[in-house]
Every structure is written in C-alpha cells, then in structure tokens.
C-alpha cells in the first residue's frame, strides 16, 4: 500500500457464557484452488517475488504484510481460511472441538509432522511458540508487538507482565493434543489461531534468538535457504518432508527485496521479477498490457493483473465527545457530503472502492451499502445542516472541523477532497498534520483531535475483527471514545454464540446499531494491485494479501 495503516490490535477483554458448542474441521490447504488453470506447467522452478524489506519473518514479530508473506510459506498455524469456500479449515490441527461455554478449545494435531530441522511438531511446540511471544525475557532487544492475539488466553496478563513462567491457559495432555482455556467466551477463537504468528516453533528457537530471527525453522511447505540478507533477499526452497498436504510444486522462491513499488515494477517490466505490485498511476496500462484476472485473485496466462477486494478499509474517526461532533445528525451530514467515488477515481484512478460500511467485502456477513448514510447525497446532507445549522448571509454555518492526518503517500490529497466537500456546504475546515508515529502514540490515544484518518487491516476474516476493537466501550482502538451500551452487549453476546450463522446474524444487528450512530465515516476499501509475469501459470492471492506458494505453478 502507498500509506501506513494500522494492523496492531488489542482485544479488550469481556465475555458472556456461551451456549453449547462443538466444532470439527477437516484439514485443508492454504489459499484457493488454482487447479483450473489451462496450459502446460513446468516442473519446479523458482518464483521471483517482490517484497519491501520486512520488519520480521520470525513468528515472534510477524505483523506487516511483507514479513507475513514470507512467514506464511515457512510456518503453518493450527487453522487456515479457505476464501474460495468461505470456510475455516484445519491445517496443523486436523480437527478441534469446543466446550459448552465456548471458552475451552481442544485442537487435535496432525500426527508425525516435522519441522525443517527434522524434529517433530508437538503440542509443546505450539505452547512454547505462544509463550515465546508473550515472555518479556525472550529478547533482550525488544518485546514482541503481537501478543494481543493471545490476550484472551488464561494467564496472558501474568506471563506478559513477567509474573509467570508459562501461559497457564495452554496445556498439552499429549504430543498431539493442545488445550486452550480462555478467560472469557469467544466462539471465533479458531480464527485467531490461523494467524502465522501463532505457529509452532522448534526447540532451537529458544536456544538462539538472533539466529532464528534471520533464519527461522518452521513447519511450512518451504524452508530457508541460507539466512535473510537484510535489504537484499530471502531465499526459500521446497520442504520435501512437508506433512500437511501436497509438497510444493515450485523448487523455491526468491524474495527480491526492493526499496519501493516503482523500482520493483521497473524490474518486473525488465523481466527480472515474476510478481510485483503495480503503481497506482500505471494500473490501467498494466491491465491493458497484461490482462485482468477474472476473479481478481487468480492470475493465469494472459490474465495476470490482480484487482480483487482486500480485507481493509480507510475511514475517518470522529471524536464523539467533541462539542460539535457529539451531534449524531452532524456526523451523518458529514458522511453524506463526501464524494467517495470522486476520491477513488481522482486520487487512486479507480483502484479503490467506495465504502458502504465499516465491514469490507470478503468478510462473511458483509452487506453491500449496510451503512445507509455512507453514501454521497449532498441534498440529504444539506437538509440536515439547514435544519440544525442554518447558513448565514455568507453561507457559513458556524461549524468548524479540523482533520488530523499524516502527509505521507496520498493522505493529503484525500483529506483535501474531503475538506472541499465539507467547505462547499458552509463548514469551515482546517488541517492538523503531524508525523504518523506521533499521531498514533499521542494524538489519537489522548483523543486530542476532532476527526482523523485511519486504515484498518483484518487480522482474521471475521466481522468481530472490524466491530469489537473499533467500537466497544474503552477499546484501545476506539480512539473517538464511542460508547453505546446496546452495542457493547450485542458484541459480547455475539462472541458467545455457538452457531456460525447465528453469530454472524448477531454481528449484523450490531453493525446496524453502529451505523445509526455514525461514530466513524467509512471512505473506501482497498483492492489488490499485483501483476504476474507470463512465467506464472497459476497463482492465487487471497483477500488478506497472502499467497500459498506451494500451489503456484510456472509455465513450461
């Protein structure tokens, strides 16, 4: 992406007793099915794939999409999500079951699976991997930033604070059984377990942190070939003793680290890369030259540009305690005044999609245009404003809104278009710009803003991941200080519902309540901007921007 977006989460604790629940899941492969591609495929070969320099490829720090892409090939977590079937399936776990209270999960592991060093993957491997993330003594240089994934596991607080030596909520009755006890009901917990950061680690990860950090030993379909050469390259080769399905079709992957998107795309055009991101200003030309994927996610010969929806959103937060923005009607008017399509077309040349709600396409439970006032309707906005904030002789309404944002990437252009739309209706606007790090660490946490921009990327493909962290009272990511007792109760009720369909239906009810309050203004959803070379016979990139490269085939 061309701008920084938040993907660190803190799940605020809370929960109710769940109804009876039991679930089993069959083992499955990551990603989608690419078997339908036509043409002959070459045996093996090495895929040349562009990434920026990642922050980490070790599960200890897997949080941004560049490192996640590498880690996804090296490690297999307990579960994975099949987007082509909208179904969570087992990966390192062949099945799981849940107690009646939905606060204890028993995962049954694939037996005899191996790490890349030949040692056996056991339940202890998961326990020590999770404890390695939380234990403040794991690294002398920095604590892991991703412990929030385990915040609901019993014993999280004690271990992360250095007051305990183990995560007491995780036990290992035998080598092939992992039992996880939560501190509250959360029926969606198996979705949390799909994150690559929660993969198992072998004993060597505990023996030498620095060595493992640059050359991780995992249980995935590919293994390291040498170590990560910081700023230059990461090489992987097929792991022939892979235990969770078919072996990779590729011989290996060369992750070619480039400094920026434009440089990488130039390398792609020169024939030096097989997969690269397309700069926004060149996407239309790329589609014309290379052809567009039929489903947006699967690249095949002659249809090589991926433009599918991603599980992410760009939105405006509103400080609901602000003297002006505490007025719900004004918040609705501000949303109605914004021409989202113009932003998508002008700033992003159609590579974004106007957001009709906070939950993006690709999430089970998504409803198109669910937030009725997340649309462009100047007349409706003007009607609200005329009734409550009539304009004076100069067309001014005695309203002023300051927008907080960073100047990186395209944010200035987006915010200027938003302010122009508001100004056209007699609202005085101004900018409050700062460095992104300062905004995230000071401005937003202290609620020192009226309105501000933010991006949100899904950790897990569930509605809860877009509703609970952003809108529950007191939530660490609820920067606008929104609070609605009915929303809080609905979210907690939903978390404890056993049935997937009933749980999603409850989240949809809560989503409607939030839409009525309009505590944030959805602006647009993100889309893929990737291209594959003609060497690639078939490649599938899911809505989370992850690709199971064990299924990738090169053309003969």
Regions found by a protein language model. Give the residues of each.
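Gly/Pro-rich hinge or "lid" segments in bacterial periplasmic/extracellular proteins
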Residues: 82-83, 175, 181-248, 252
């Amino acid at each position: 992406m061309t701008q920084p977006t938040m993907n660190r989460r803190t799940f605020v604790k809370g929960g109710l007793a769940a109804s009876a629940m039991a679930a089993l899941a069959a083992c499955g492969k990551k990603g989608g099915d690419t078997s339908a591609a036509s043409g002959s495929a070459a045996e093996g070969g090495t895929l040349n794939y562009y990434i920026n320099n990642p922050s980490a490829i070790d599960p200890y720090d897997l949080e941004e999409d560049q490192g996640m892409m590498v880690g996804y090939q090296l490690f297999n977590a307990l579960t994975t999500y099949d987007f082509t079937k909208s179904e969570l399936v087992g990966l390192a776990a062949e099945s799981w079951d849940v107690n009646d209270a939905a606060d204890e999960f028993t995962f049954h592991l694939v037996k005899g699976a191996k790490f890349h060093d030949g040692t056996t993957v056991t339940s202890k491997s998961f326990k020590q991997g999770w404890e390695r993330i939380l234990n403040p003594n794991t690294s002398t240089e920095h604590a892991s930033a991703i412990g929030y994934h385990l915040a609901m596991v019993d014993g999280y607080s004690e271990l992360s604070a250095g007051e305990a030596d183990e995560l007491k909520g995780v036990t290992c009755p035998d080598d092939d059984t992992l039992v996880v006890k939560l501190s509250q009901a959360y029926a969606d917990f198996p979705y949390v377990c799909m994150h690559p950061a929660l993969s198992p680690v072998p004993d060597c990860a505990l023996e030498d942190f620095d060595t493992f950090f640059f050359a991780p030993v995992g249980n995935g379909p590919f293994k390291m070939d040498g170590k990560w050469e910081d700023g230059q390259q990461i090489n992987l080769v097929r792991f022939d003793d892979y235990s969770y399905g078919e072996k990779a079709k590729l011989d290996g992957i060369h992750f070619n680290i480039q400094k920026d998107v434009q440089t990488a795309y130039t390398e792609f055009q020169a024939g030096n890369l097989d997969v690269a991101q397309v700069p926004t200003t060149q996407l239309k030309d790329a589609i014309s030259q290379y052809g567009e994927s039929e489903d947006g996610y699967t690249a095949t010969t002659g249809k090589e540009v991926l433009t599918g929806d991603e599980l992410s959103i760009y939105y405006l937060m509103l400080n609901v305690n602000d003297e002006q923005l505490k007025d719900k009607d004004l918040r609705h008017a501000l949303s109605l005044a914004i021409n989202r399509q113009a932003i998508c077309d002008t700033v992003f040349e159609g590579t974004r999609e106007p957001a009709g709600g906070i939950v993006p396409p690709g999430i089970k439970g998504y409803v198109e245009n669910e937030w009725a006032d997340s649309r462009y309707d100047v007349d409706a906005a003007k009607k609200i404003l005329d009734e409550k904030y009539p304009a004076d002789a100069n067309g001014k309404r005695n309203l002023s809104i300051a927008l907080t944002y960073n100047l990186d990437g395209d944010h200035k252009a987006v915010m200027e278009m938003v302010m122009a739309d508001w100004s056209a209706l007699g609202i005085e606007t101004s900018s409050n710009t700062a460095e992104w790090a300062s905004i995230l660490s000071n401005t937003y946490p202290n609620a020192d803003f009226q309105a501000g921009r933010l991006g949100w990327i899904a950790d897990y493909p569930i509605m809860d991941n877009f509703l609970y962290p952003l809108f529950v009272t007191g939530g660490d990511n609820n920067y606008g200080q929104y609070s609605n007792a009915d929303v809080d109760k609905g979210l907690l009720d939903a978390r404890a519902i056993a049935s997937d369909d009933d749980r999603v239906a409850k989240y949809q009810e809560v989503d409607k309540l939030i839409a009525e309050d309009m505590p944030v203004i959805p602006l647009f959803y993100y889309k893929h901007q990737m291209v594959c070379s003609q060497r690639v016979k078939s490649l599938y990139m899911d809505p989370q921007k992850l690709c199971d490269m064990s299924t990738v085939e090169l053309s003969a």
